[in-house]
């Protein structure tokens, strides 16, 4: 990592602030020069693996074959357009190509932990969206022949386990509904696909090593988590924890339900969303809080319960707002075309989709379209900042928590996946960064950041604040949490959350009439 520049993270707990230097490659900067070695225990020698001489590449995964004679190495080009899978001889370190994947139009999606050996090492189980949706494939270890295992206009989400004895793969997918996560099993040859979990909603599952039992954490957007066990056939279900205490406590509070909706983004793509209205509110029209993440790695409008956000959004709704969550184009779960349409121009498509949702909700849910705020963290904070600068006047206000405000200030893998390298798309970096539109800002922005954020550095919010000031704008607010990192959750998370959402509510009360 000596080639990677250091970024100082400052904390203020002592008389003299502490500075921790973090190796952090920004967009366009030098990346770590990674080499792969095999250590021969008997000879006590390091055997170099031939992955090429190009230092400007990523090693995205390594995995041993079951007989320990072969090491599988995955490498990705710096522009993330080509992924190669190499077979390395464990004795000599020499490599031969097994498989490659290339995307000239945008980028290749890398799946952490990809490349399970199955069938006694005869094939490699692979996840890829090369045919438009994320699916399973078998790559034959001797020839590199690729055989599809799953197919369809839905996506595999995780590989949970494989059973060589029965030649079965256990995986989760959103085949039943793009808002849900269900467990399935399928034969190695792609036959006998069977759904195992049954309850509508979201199933996080773990499978025992002997492939006999499943532990299932099940929830839906209106149902707190239930923990249960079952056989691998889905039968013999036994509830282990019903979360009765939480359910009983919720009976004492006016908790509004979450309702799902679907909005058409264009002629061929639809977006998932949900909306919460106050438990009791006589107003003919309500102000709207659009809660959106929008990044390429995560869906939010799912049929699942998350304590931090499910309850917090309900609490905000009971303060007098309608709260809606949307997964715009650019998010996963609906195919490569849906997710990658933001390539080289992030922000524009997502904001267009938020405007579509604003219009839809104002027509169908008694929303005051003149009183709409955008709020979220990280990439969602970026969208909130962009909405109030580049798209000033389209939304009444925004809450930008730990926002990226200039993609040149963010780490290289994510930024370059979105925008390519700065040297190849300088105009795209300029047009997608909120700091370049502060002259257009009209008001209504609340900026929040932890000063020790080692993911999205404080520099992003400080630079936005500076540019707003240079543009002679004074009608924005900001609050910084000293010595706190990206999630504002280290140390005393409950105190921080109460502080954060109290401040947000006070800001929205002033902004949304």
What are these regions (language model features)?
Residues 1-216, 221-225, 229-230:
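Beta-propeller folds
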Residues 5-6, 68, 74, 204-513:
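Serine-hydrolase catalytic core recognition
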